[in-house]
């Protein structure tokens, strides 16, 4: 029997791992990449390309290397825990080379349309029209994996800012920003306090005369560096922490988180405290913002009510004159124009079962990969989604009925609406551990902690209290990797390695990652006791 041919659209993080997932399942991938290289979002270019994600030169990833790597290919131990975008791209190049992925990619090829074949209800096949160097080609595929991301179309709500058309200074979306040199000596307003808004305000404040950071709601600011210097996602992303947070309930979780965040700096005093709870919005990750605020180089302001030719008037009645530049860090919209009616997106809302499969198709041969915004890394989620999708394409896994899928989609949407503030930013939100565990169950690779407690208690303990790293989903089941156990048990060694650039005698009483976790759990238990008794 001939191999099923699968179209993979995009060769960023999701696209690369999906090519590999196809190969693991004996499928034949053909990847279409509109640019001339891999990397997607993480390939920096001085001039942004239309239809392609764009980053600024200084971008550091917000998730640590142990949490963001692909499950069977750890990031080299000497790489920093939080990598510069150039190092992320280099990791992707190593991954592509290691698994021989490049030969399956057709560069400078744009996907024009993806349509059902006339016999789709029985064949599940798709007609894919592509264009390369001005010439169109039509191919038929047995499945399609859409890996185009959700950071390509800038959301620029100019209608919400009266007077912007009269403003004589420069204004643009944060997607166009590259470096702070051109803002030297200028007065700059950054609108939006997501990760990009915070980063830009901090970086520009090193050259600008004054930076104003405008926010509608405020934000809770999370540091990359946690207790004892461990990466914050390493400390927060464990199964035991996840179990306890469910037991404690949302009110106690939020109270505890807000107390921890305010110990670093008082969000109310700094003008950042929002009305929503700490977990009611995706937190902003920024290590330097409080330092720039307390130095007066960044001033936090409310929402802009209107612009004049040279000034901004805020909703509290205050005014800032002689504004030179306005940067809209207002996020992104996403769409799939080449899919026509197969996947409908309305105000950044889309109906996908488990955030992957459109529920209305007669055959489950189309999957959207990486369309999720977790408090954690997207790459390993994309990988698990790809592993699941290729199993479904191959017929190894089945999906529920359309009505069952829609019921779950609506239930998830209602839960997200209750938890998060109404925002374009929260339409594809998902919890990192819950999402990973859920899909791992579907793939058949979720570790059995109870069984391991008897056969390998050391490993079971690490899986329970240690960080929920991607490599844990290579311990058993399809795609099992022989190096998984050792990689899990040496996680702390790789965290420490890039920091040991000066030889220091290690204190035998020093605090290990496990000790830090036990202390955190003890504090959490105490918080529960105090809250309820």
UniProtKB/Swiss-Prot annotation:
Function as written in the Swiss-Prot or TrEMBL entry: Acts as a Baeyer-Villiger monooxygenase on a broad range of substrates. Catalyzes the insertion of an oxygen atom into a carbon-carbon bond adjacent to a carbonyl, which converts ketones to esters. Active on diverse carbonyl compounds, whereas soft nucleophiles are mostly non- or poorly reactive. In contrast with other forms of FMO it is non- or poorly active on 'classical' substrates such as drugs, pesticides, and dietary components containing soft nucleophilic heteroatoms. Able to oxidize drug molecules bearing a carbonyl group on an aliphatic chain, such as nabumetone and pentoxifylline.
Needed co-factor(s): FAD
Keywords: Endoplasmic reticulum, FAD, Flavoprotein, Lipid metabolism, Membrane, Methylation, Microsome, Monooxygenase, NADP, Oxidoreductase, Phosphoprotein, Transmembrane, Transmembrane helix
UniProt record, GO biological process: lipid metabolic process; regulation of cholesterol metabolic process; xenobiotic metabolic process
Catalytic activity: N,N-dimethylaniline + NADPH + O2 + H(+) = N,N-dimethylaniline N-oxide + NADP(+) + H2O; NADPH + O2 + H(+) = H2O2 + NADP(+); heptan-2-one + NADPH + O2 + H(+) = pentyl acetate + NADP(+) + H2O; octan-3-one + NADPH + O2 + H(+) = pentyl propanoate + NADP(+) + H2O
GO molecular function, one term: monooxygenase activity
Binding site for FAD: 10-14, 33, 41-42, 62-63
Protein name: Flavin-containing monooxygenase 5
Residues found modified as Dimethylated arginine: 5
Primary site of residence: membrane
Membrane-traversing stretches: 513-533
Record: residues binding NADP(+): 196-199
Modification type Phosphothreonine: residues: 284
Domain of life where this protein originates: Eukaryota
